[in-house]
Structures are given as C-alpha cells and as structure tokens.
Amino acid sequence: MIKANTILGNKFVAKNRTGASYFLSSEELKSLGYIDINRALKAVPGVNFYEEDGFGLRPNISLRGTSPQRSSKITLMEDGVLIAPAPYSSPAAYYFPSVLRMEAIEILKGSSQVQYGPFTTGGVINMLSSSAPEEGLKAKFQTSYGSFNSSQIHSSVGRSTENLSYLFEYLSMNSDGFKKLNSGENTGFNITDLMGKVRLKSAEDSATPQFLEFKYHFFDELSNETYLGISERDFNTNPFDRYAASQEDNMDARQVQLMLTHSISISEQFKIVTNVYDNTFSRNWYKLSGVVVDDSKKGLETVLAAPSNYPNHFAVLKGLTDSEDDALFVKANNRVYTSRGVQTKLDYHWYGKSGIFHDLEIGTRLHYDEEDRFQWEDGYRIQNADMLSTSEGIKGAKGNRISSATAWATYAMYKLKYNGLSLSPGLRVESIKLGREDFGKSNPNRNSSDLSSRENQITALIPGIGFNYTFSNQLSVFGGLHKGFSPPGNTPGEQAEESINYELGSRFSIGRLSGEFIGFFNDYSNLLGSDLAASGGTGSLDQFNAGSVHVSGLELLLNYNLAAENAAVQVPITFAYTLTNAIFQSNFGSDEDIWGVVSTGDRVPYIPQNQWTLTARLEHKKYELNLSSRLSGVFNTQAANGNQSTVEQVPSNFIVDLSAKYHLTKQLRLTAQIVNLFDEVYLVSRVPAGFRPGHPFGVYTGLQFDL
C-alpha cells in the first residue's frame, strides 16, 4: 500500500523491492552527523559525486553514471514532491535540502522507477523531512561548535493528539570557511532553515481514515562562495588560498515551500494520496566572470588553465598589481525559480485465486516551472589588493529571459506476488512543453519590441518491468529492464535523452554476513550534456547531443556484525564498492568545449571508475564510535582514454572521518566529530575555474538534548 510522501519507508521494503534501492535511516544519519550530503551518501553503492565547496552546499551527484553537474540528471524530491528549483526547464540544483533536518533519505535505482520522473535513467533521491511525533509531546535541541568558527543550532518541538499533530523546526548553520583571502574576509556561509507541519487527522476508529497536512518551509543562505579556483602551482604550495579578485563573490539565496498533503484510505484495499505544492527559489550569485588587461578580456578558466600565457591577467586575479578601471567583471547571476503543481496517486490491492496478490498503483501530476533570469555585470578595479567599484552594469544586459515548462505526467504500475515471485511491469508517460521568452539585452522593462520566443514539445512513453524472486530468507534474485529518459531543452526539435537500462542482482544473508551484488548496463542512444558555468561552460544551459554512450558497472554492499551475539556491544561493519565504466561510443566535438573533443572509447568526464567506502561502528548503551573511510577514484574533467595525461585529471583520494557520542543521561549526549582525520590535502575538482581543495582536518564538538 502506498504511503503519503515516501518511496520505501523502511529498510525492509528496500530489501524486497524489484529494483536496487537503499534506505538511509534516521539512526544512520544521526550517527554520522554530517552537514554535507556528499558525505552522508558516500556509503550508498551506485552513487558518484564530486565535491566543490567542501560543505556540500551545491552537490554534484550522479546515480549510475549520469552526468553529476549540479545533480541535474537525477530526480530530486523532498517528501515525495520535486524539489529542484525548476525540475523541467532548469533542473540544476542550486538549492539542495539541508541533510541535518532530514529523518531519512531514500535512494531508488533500477527498473522500478516509472513511478517517479522526469529523470528515469539513474534514479531518485527522496529526502524525508522531520515528522511530527506519533504520540505525546517531544522536543530536541542540539548544538555544536568547531573548526573555522563553525557552529550549528538545531531544535524542534512537536506534539500529537488524537486529531491533531504538529512540528516546528529551526536550523542554523554558520562557518567562516576554510579558504583564506589575504584581506582576512569571511569565505564561509550562514544558513537558516525554518519548517512547520500541522496535520489534522480523523479519529482512529474512522471507517475512512484520512489526514490533511500543511507544510511550510523557509530557507535562507548567504555564502561567500566563488567559481574562481587557484592555479596548480598555488594549489601545491597554498591549497586553501582564495585570490583577491574573488573577494566580492557571494550567493544570496532564499527558498519557500508551501505544500498540502491529503491521504484517505477508502477501504483496507483502496487508498488515495494527493499533494499540492508551490516552491519559489530566488538567488543572486554575484561572482567574478572575467578579467581585462589592455582591452583583452579573458575567462577565468582560460587564465587558470595556463597562467604563464596570461601573466598580467593572472597578476590582477591575485591582486599582485593595481589594475585599470573595469579590469574585473562581476556578474549578478540574478534568477527567480518557480515550481508548482498537483499530483495524486491511488492504490488498490486484492488477493486473487491461489493466493496471488495483486496491486495496481496509478498516479498523475500536472506541473509548471520556470526560471526567470535578470542578470547584469558590474566593473571593478584592483588597488592594493582591494576591489573598488568602477561601473554599474545595465540590468538585464547579461540575461533577460524566462525559460518555462508545462508538464503532464502519468503512470501505472502493476505488482503481482505469487509464492516467492514478484513482478512489477509499469508505464510512464511524460508530455512536456518547453519554452523561452528572451527580452533582449537592452530591454530592462521587458516590453515586446525585442521579444524573441522559441518552443519545444515532446511526449515520451517510458516502460519498465522488474522482478524479485525469493528462494529463502537468505537468498533472493532481482532485476529488470526499463527505459531511461531525460527531458530536452527548449531548442525547437531537440530530442530527449534516451537509454535502455538493465540490471540483475542478488540479496543474500549468510550467518552474520548480509549484502547485495548488482550488475547494471545503461545503453544511451543520445546522451545530453548541458552548458553549465559550474562545469566550465558559458552558463547558457543549452543542451548538446553527446551521442551513444555505454555505462556498465557493479555495485557491492556487505554488512557484517563482529559482535552479533554480544548483548552489551555491537560492532557493525559496512563495505560498499562501485565500479562504473562510462564510455563514449561515437566521435564528436562540443561547441561549448565542456568535454573537449570526444573519440570513441573515451571515458565520460566526472565519473570515477572505482570507489569504495568502509564504515565501522562500536555501539554501547553509554557510547558510540563511528569510523568512516572512503576511496574516491581518479576522474577527468574532459573526455579521456586510458593513456591520457593528467592535464585534466582529478587524482584519487582516501579520506577518513571519525565521530563519537557519549550518553550522559537518557536525554543528554555529548558529541564529537573529526572530518578528514589524517588531514589529507586533496583536489576535488578543476571546475568551474581552477583547482579546488576538499575539506581539511576539522574538529567539531556538541551537545544533544531530547525531551
């Protein structure tokens, strides 16, 4: 039977689904205590990512080899509704929910994805926010402080009665950042999260149990983050430097979500769940975009790729020399995103002859989203390593357009269970109308005189089928076949990204050892790349066809408890390994030069071939100790074959984190966390422009109190 806002709901469902899935429970999230979603997901097989800012503010997540840039090729949801700023028209996740306010995370991969879209190739990540208590009054307060003047305050209070429940939550995260400007200015962030939920419930003995829940969420971020990295030489000597020309860079962002959920069980066999949602995300990322010397303007990535070729430009970026007026251009990437819609799903199940279980789930969603760009570029000069304003740009001159999408999606999923066999065929339909209205560079009032429009429409049928066969409580086999889909852009005639995806796996339990082993193969007929500034592009968001690609891989998950028979102490160990081979099957050259010149046999950028994670926990009623280690394999930022030099390469790294918790009383606990235990200096990315370091050694201590 369907649940209101969840995909899985618990680990048992995840282990019995006809497709690869993972349920990251509340206990796991609490034991890790991460604010960085990348670190929270690192133990999940099939999840690839590359870091950018060291705190996970804007993650780049890939599932099974999808393009990771800004997590724009996976379906992101919070409480069962789409949460990316504009999921169809501009899916790049410049907003990502704070992992600290989540009570669980659900990851779905493989063949049973037709219920969720629009991105069906890699998978789904559904973030489950804190829920009201099931009974009585509950409250919690936790705080921490540590390296780089970083602090957190997280508190909530909730109550549940027979007909009413509510939860109010507050989260504040702050840091001065670990990168250093010579001026000593802050390079960190300030984030505030507020959430409220109120649920009206029918009586427990009602013939038709139902509830109506209203959710409000507010998010505010001010982060002094930049796209400007540093040169390779400077990275090798002072990896945490920030150049003077980035001192004005900052992201000012705000997100508001309104959501209404209604759930009714008409009978024990028939249930309907409806969501109405409205998300608004506004942001202005004011950041350096170019440098001019002697009337020669160069992009940041051009200068940092070869500083010796542009010594004067490079000196201005570092603040080593005074410049002319308007030597530095800082772009106001000012955008407002809207995402709203209504979705409903119904579930009816029954038992037929010979004990065969049948379940039919049907869902539909009407959705609209848009990205409104109104951007400009200001001029600055450098004097004594300080930036001084010299000119104000014309509003709208660097982007004055609205991209939008109207989408209707529906699906039907049938499930059959007989003895140990489960089958789940399904079909999804996506009908999408994408458009763009460009008002021109010199039309701040947006009259129709300079308006140019374009439109693209597509309707896609997305079938899939999965199976699971349980031989015993210790062994099952599952697999499936489904069509992968990713919406195109608004360029007329542009085709969607399509693939045929296969998977086959087994779940097993042998004594203290349990786990799963999965093989997958994704056959792309036309992989779509996106021109994102975050990956070194121009930021137009236009998509380009990268041709045929084969992505194959293996996922291994092992769980073993060293002290399973010890009542006083538990020592669970988890090992996760992912092998991913993402290979181009054709030649092409990207006009945007994001991936470089591609030849058959080259590896798709940003996808490491190997990665593994090993975690060990020591659990006692008075204390907990968690050790987590991860090896991230080498990857390239441009297409590469096995013999390519390291010019565009991000080397592998091995990082260990440690956390501990001590229970002073039943309600009061002390916490401690060490990030990057051995203080490894490691490169996480060469994009958007220059070298970027990972989080250095950091110590954080805190206090938790529950009522």
Language-model-detected regions and their locations in the chain:
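Short, acidic, small-residue-rich periplasmic hinge/interaction motif at the N-terminus
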Residues: 1-30, 38
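Extracytoplasmic beta-strand/coil segments of soluble accessory domains associated
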Residues: 38-81, 85
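Short acidic/polar hinge/loop motifs at secondary-structure boundaries
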Residues: 81-109
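Short strand-turn segments of transmembrane beta-barrel domains in outer membranes
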Residues: 112-114, 124, 128-159, 170
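Transmembrane beta-barrel wall of Gram-negative outer-membrane proteins
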Residues: 145-174, 182-226, 250-254, 260-266
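Face-selective signature of the C-terminal outer-membrane beta-barrel domain
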Residues: 205-213, 253-439, 558
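Structural signature of Gram-negative outer-membrane beta-barrels, strongest in the C-terminal barrel
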Residues: 337, 354-361, 365-369, 398-524, ...
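Gram-negative outer-membrane beta-barrel transporters
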Residues: 417, 472, 544-639, 666, ...
